[in-house]
Amino acid sequence: MPDAIANTATPVTVVALQQMKRDGRKIVGVVAWDWQMAQIVDRAGVDIVSVGDTVGINLWGHANPLEVTMDEMLIVTKAVRRGVKRALLSVDFPFGPLQEGPDAALRAAIRFVKEAGVDMVKLDGAADYPEAVAAIARAGIPVFAQFGITPHTALKHGIDYKSTLKLDVQLPPTLTAHLVGQAKRLEAAGACLLDFTHSGPVAGPAVVAAVAIPVIGGLGGGPWLDGRMRMGHAAIGYAASGIDHPLDTYAQVAQTTLAAITALVDDVRAGRQIKGGIPVKQH
């Protein structure tokens, strides 16, 4: 059983993930924001548990992903750390420290390691901040560097950004070469893993072949990469929008939750004992 394997296996390390690439074994990453989910995904045998700054939009109802602060990310990461025993724990930088320069980025990385016990830090838009990647890597902190196709890079190379999200997209050779170059520079700066956003089946394999470190993808990724990253809540269909408009996921937890809470309401209204409450003796 997967959980039996996960509970007896040795902790996942960066070295182990890099060996998985060399062996041709796919890497699995899941985004988690709380202690309960962390325990479950760790038991399932994922390789990476990533604490995403997407917690603001998906769990707290923020309208802007930039609202999440460093202190908030530390609180969330500490909770996830308590639930993860085997998988490698990564955390997203919130907006701010990376943009403030290498010194600020290094201070933030050190805080995540010292205060939250992370194994790796993830830098969004890392291709624009190679000095920060290098500074953190020199300090001995593993860096998970995100890069990829953005509306800006698509426009620069004369293509429609939305077209790059299709599985059969054919990217201009100049854009593929640009992305390969970014990946190589991030590897040279000291990144130990890459998160390639909107890789597609053309640039994705090219980047995978160009670097020795694992290339993982969430949005716009596919089996052409060394592994995949998925939000835990998305994988199980846990979003209010999924009640009326369910997506193709591995479960429909939002619908199950609605049915369960509706049943709870019915039991209370009808004067019945609720499930999981203190048993009531029948007279």
Task: Please annotate each region the language model reported.
Residues P2-H283:
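Alpha/beta enzyme core
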